[in-house]
From Swiss-Prot:
The active site is at residue 37. Pathway: Cofactor biosynthesis; biotin biosynthesis; biotin from 7,8-diaminononanoate: step 1/2. It holds the Pfam family AAA_26. While ADP, ATP, ITP, TTP and UTP can be crystallized in the enzyme in approximately the same place as CTP, it is their phosphate tails that anchor them to the enzyme, their nucleoside moieties do not bind in the same way CTP does. One of its GO terms (molecular function) is magnesium ion binding. This is Dethiobiotin synthetase BioD. The gene is bioD. It comes from Mycobacterium tuberculosis (strain ATCC 25618 / H37Rv). It is found in: Cytoplasm. It catalyses: (7R,8S)-7,8-diammoniononanoate + CO2 + ATP = (4R,5S)-dethiobiotin + ADP + phosphate + 3 H(+). The lineage of its organism: Bacteria, Bacillati, Actinomycetota, Actinomycetes, Mycobacteriales. GO terms for cellular component: cytosol. It comes from the Bacteria. Mg(2+) binds at residues 16, 49, 108. Its cofactor is Mg(2+).
Length: 226
């Protein structure tokens, strides 16, 4: 059994499509997969990341706790809706209930690593510590990514949360000078596990499966679950 939290260097970097791609690659390797997103914001505009993972990767074990209408940080979205954030133990129980032998459980955060997900001030990093999970960090290839990535990895290391690697959430075709340079530099910071092509979320399920299998190293994926 393996729990992996999927975080990012910010909002809109591609965490959901990375969750879906890794889930698809794992399922194609014969691994049972569950995906959890404890907190979802932006439901008023139709945001539903778990449904997107199900559509792209065919995962049926999908779990969430709190949903807020406005596309804001969870604490702000909850306040705007007159609702509360979930409690820390609720999130931990949700993840623990999904975890089982032979299964890869992916936990997608909201925004970046230190965004408040539960009261009082509980972040995805805290949850990772609670469930003994490593973190896969979704990054961009854009200017500024090196600083954002290093800050995220330092925040993980400060609480002894191991980094399972980096994934570039949207890789341009063709890559420009900045993107190509940043990809090389990112690989010197941590292992780059995959670079997903820009627009991957628009693929149909069959093409998405093929892309996912090609994007990740099969041996690494197979080794995620002991």
């Amino acid at each position: 059994m393996t729990i992996l939290v999927v975080t990012g260097t910010g909002t809109g970097v591609g965490k959901t499509v990375v969750c879906a791609a890794l889930a698809s690659a794992a399922r194609q390797a014969g691994i049972d997969v569950a995906v959890c997103k404890p907190v979802q914001t932006g439901t008023a505009r139709g945001d539903d990341d778990l449904a997107e993972v199900g559509r792209l990767a065919g995962v049926t074990q999908l779990a969430g706790l709190a949903r807020y209408p406005q596309p804001m940080a969870p604490a702000a979205a909850a306040e705007h809706a007159g609702m509360a954030l979930p409690a820390r133990d609720q999130i931990v129980r949700l993840i623990a209930d999904l975890d089982r032998p032979g299964r890869l459980t992916l936990v997608e955060g909201a925004g970046g690593l230190l965004v408040e997900l539960a009261e009082p001030g509980v972040t995805l990093r805290d949850v990772a510590v609670d469930v003994a999970a490593a973190a896969l960090v979704v990054v961009t290839a854009d200017l500024g990514t090196l600083n954002h990535t290093k800050l995220t990895l330092e925040a993980l290391a400060a609480q002894q949360v191991s980094c399972a690697g980096l994934v570039i959430g949207s890789w341009p075709d063709p890559p420009g000078l900045v993107a190509a340079s940043n990809r090389s530099a990112l690989a010197r910071i941590a292992m780059v596990r995959a670079a997903l092509p820009a627009g991957a979320a628009s693929l149909d399920a069959g093409d998405f499966a093929a892309m996912s299998a090609a994007a990740f190293d099969r041996n690494w994926v197979a080794g995620l679950v002991g």
